Amino acid sequence: ITDHDRNRCEDDFLNDNLIDFSLMRLSKEKYLIEEKDLYIFSSFFYKRYIQGKSNYRSNKHYDNTIKSREDLAYSYVEKWTKNIDIFQCKYLLIPVNKDIHWSLLIVCNPDKINVPKGTAEDDDDYFCIYHLDSLGCHNTKALTMNIYTYLKKAWKVMKKKKDADKKKEGDTNNNDEKKEGFARLKYDKVKGIPKQANSTDCGVFVTLYAEHFLKYLLASGKNIGTVTRRMFIEKQYDKIFGMKFRERGNNFYPWFNSSRSTKERFALKILIDDKEELYN
């Protein structure tokens, strides 16, 4: 964290350093989420993945091993999660920076991506992606499709490695092998969430969305809950995000007050000063 980063806490657009710092603090210091429950991707992840897709045409002319745009994109970020099995996590948080705007993707039950479409029951853990956007200007379908494509490739790579390891150990039993198939992409652009009132608070709202989501995850105790097919279809934001249901009007009370953004900026600046020796 530099002085330039710190100065952005006043009223400027939060950059990648500040987003990563804020999200890391939430998961590692404030709420102490275990790795088996949550993985937070770097703020560079999505941008780097898209760079790989964009470079496909120029790369395929001199590298005939590149089979597809998606394979090249995956190769750009493959090593970023080499030390963690993201499919053991219940949730993945992915901050997205696109067109000078931040939004947040929350992937639920990534391990259920291999459940063939049409086979999930209402109360089963369900693979889905939520999109929280404080301006509503990001294309939810495009963003979630890119992450869906990444996860499918990551699953195939992971399974291939596990099969190879079993073969090395002399285990040739394929009885536990599931029929190849993937769940459909199911996404939801969450409505009714607090929105920014200016052009610079999008990063602050990403941290606020993440904080309130993590806070609710831990509210139920040590056993962090999950999202079922029924919860997704019925948009049970009270059970997923902890939003309070408003019986009159059939909607939800505000998740938090939008004015929190000003306090959040001040708190972030103070935190950077307090942690200067540790994070500089």
Please describe what each predicted stretch is.
Residues 1-103, 107-129, 137-140, 166-167, ...:
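Cysteine protease catalytic domains with a Cys-His-Asp triad
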Residues 4-5, 17-21, 76-79, 146, ...:
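Exposed alpha-helical structural elements
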Residues 21-24, 28, 42, 94-98, ...:
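Ordered, helix-dominated protein-protein interaction surfaces in large eukaryotic regulatory proteins
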Residues 144, 152-280:
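C-terminal folded domains that constitute the principal catalytic or ligand-binding module
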